[in-house]
């Protein structure tokens, strides 16, 4: 019993010692708690890096909902709950900051521009507007999203990346010839439904721009967003801004090199020779029940059995089993290189880029890589100079060269041939004992089979014996812009004028082998072999090696040698487009009220050497108002005219 009393006494002493030890800690914590509970009023002025006060900067105490906004003179006042609090400062277009109070009551803040915040500012209808105050329907992405798709054409890279944008590819898909058609919110007319493309404020094609020269993409979808463009904006507008230098940015050199592989996702899965022959017989008997099962127009069961056991190249004498897609197509190599320099000082900013893109072809058996590839060269130089405190000069220069190389046979023709040729028909005859044209076939490395009127073309012939074409397009684009602040008249007022000139020409070299016609049928211009008329293609079904043993062939298309290539060189009519813009902008904040407006005159004159000049002219206006970024009002109007319409009906008013 005494033992239990001793244990109880020890436990009591232990508890008292623990309590005595804990007390000093609680007492020491009291001053800290008292310090954190004391409030502190902090004030100051917020300016940009040029020393101008910033209006509407948001200041929030980290970890709380307590915040404030800077006034028209950049001043702010905020109460923090304790002296060691942290202030989070943010403003559209500037890098966010976190500032420790450290028991200070006066904190002046300088905001630094940040390109990462540009996504919060959107280019809309010849103007720039905060994303949060836009009433129209828009979508925006940056270059980072586009670089995930290494394609020769920017249009294709937009697929699935912007809501409301439909991307459809209707071209053949050859290197460079794969530009997708863009529609915003579907196709709205049976007529021309192309969207308007605006590059740095100028209506230009963006298809073959390099992703490395692009800053942002914005699409304008509804009437309020597209009204400044008039009736041409009915199908939507895509606005592209290219990269520019930033103020105070140290020179930065970027080099990019990427290599990739391009190939079709999948090919059609067709029947082999055995399956084709089985269903062919079934179809023939269904069409003509009285047909003798032993007819020469049908495949024999022995032939079908041989097809099932055959290797496919007839090296075992059991017949052919061609996969035309596997024979004709292969993966291709993509190469993309770019070098750019970007930087700026307090007075001048610049961005310069050069890039090279090479997309190899997907055709096998082409006689030269030059027959099937696409090349693109891009150059861009954007320079901004602050001539005076109020006058800004911008000079933009863009150049682009594209080179398309493709065989005389079109992609549609080659794919159609792969889709329709029976798998049991050979493409090349490995041996031929007929002296007629023998030397020509030996020189060309194989004997091309020509069957009958149903199968007039040969896959190998289409790939490497139809000649080639080379189309080179050259683009040169330049613009000169002056902008001037009119703050001496009233704060927030500015005026700008811009002139641009674009020129384009095309040079084509065509070395294709012509086709020729007999009656209603068209035949290739290259020489091929054909079974003699007394031994038709139907009879050949069950005698796959007859032509090897007998060697009784005649030329199929009345050509003992390939036709000569028809060499021709053509120069497309050069195009020149000049544009002039003059605009007046106003943006100012009065306390909680934000007011902005824009008035623009636009003139475009397009000249093609052998056509009548075409002119487009218009006025556009925009007015916006918001109260505390909560209550928004926006009015847009376009008054546009086009020479596409008859006199008296050329102009229209388009409000929204």
Each language-model region and where it sits:
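Residues on the lipid-exposed face of transmembrane beta-strands in outer-membrane beta-barrel proteins
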Residues: 186, 242, 339-345, 381-385, ...
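A surface-exposed, glycine/aromatic-enriched loop/edge motif typical of exported proteins
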Residues: 265-303, 400-450, 505-550
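Transmembrane beta-barrel strands of outer-membrane/channel proteins
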Residues: 253-261, 354-356, 395-401, 497-503, ...
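Short, small/polar-rich motifs associated with maturation and membrane association
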Residues: 1-379, 392-394
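Outer-membrane beta-barrel transmembrane domain signature of Gram-negative proteins
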Residues: 168, 319-342, 429-438, 513, ...
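Transmembrane beta-barrel architecture of outer-membrane proteins
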Residues: 153, 179, 235, 334-338, ...
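Flexible loop and strand-edge segments within Gram-negative outer membrane beta-barrel domains
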Residues: 264-266, 315-355, 359-366, 370-456, ...
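Short loop/turn motifs that connect adjacent beta-strands in outer-membrane beta-barrel proteins
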Residues: 245-251, 346-347, 390, 472, ...
